[in-house]
Amino acid sequence: MQLMDLRKQGIDIQENIPLSRFTFTKTGGPAQYLAFPKNLNELELLVDTVKENNIPLTVIGNASNLIIRDGGISGLVLILTKMDTIVANKDEATVTADAGARIIDTSEAACEAGLSGLEFAAGIPGSVGGAVFMNAGAYGGETEFVIKSVRVLTRAGEFKTYTHDEMEFGYRHSLVQETGDIVVSATFGLEPGDKWAIKAKMEYFNGLRRAKQPLEYPSCGSVFKRPAGHFVGPMIIKAGLQGKRIGGAEDSMKHAGFIVNVGGATATDYLDLIHLIQKTIKKDFGIDLQTEVRIIGKEKD
């Protein structure tokens, strides 16, 4: 079966779509093919079809901590945001969420059920799949602290469930970065708590985020991993790069660890500024800054 034949089965597949429509930076080149599976059956059909036809496959979530190069992505890009069911089980103190569900919404569902543990995620704009993939965290919380199990679809087309320990979580790392498995859902193991205390903690974290982060501009969130014993923002400030602009990409005056799109930025602008910061920090401090943001796609011809 050819990929475009799946349209006849009601699967939403589009061609040559600018991915800048979906990324939080508002940058990125086109996807050769773009699909939005609505359920596991559609996802499985898409994965089987690209495997059968040797078509490259890229999976993205909410595209919040992601830079897609200006040349775009060859093959099929899957965006899983239509797979967004969230089920809270108060008796078992768990929340199970599809990969395309927003982690913010998952945190709110836990709160409504009086379950504590996901408060840290109240302002993280990514998807559940992305949070698992990156082991997203904030304000002392990490995804790995609350993961009970993760269900995936392997590139071979088989469904599999990993336990917490099998996920090999590390700082902004998980097993699926190595295997290429597609996260389809995650179950979070939480603790019973007072709904209003949980909500107050979430609102406190959101207040910190609004005060410290440049939410008024498009951005990809935190750009760099934190090196042991150092903070990225102060190093960038000491290096004289806060406020530095290349094209429409600017190192934020509100938080130097963020790069914002102040108007008309391209992915190349972002990457050129990232490389300048890395080069300068290496020269001034002897530290190799690693990117936290996921960078994919091809350069523009």
From Swiss-Prot:
Keywords: Cell cycle, Cell division, Cell shape, Cell wall biogenesis/degradation, Cytoplasm, FAD, Flavoprotein, NADP, Oxidoreductase, Peptidoglycan synthesis. NCBIfam families: murB, PRK13905.1. Its main location: cytoplasm. This is UDP-N-acetylenolpyruvoylglucosamine reductase. Pathway: Cell wall biogenesis; peptidoglycan biosynthesis. Its cofactor is FAD. PROSITE patterns: FAD_PCMH (PS51387). It is an enzyme of class 1 (oxidoreductase).
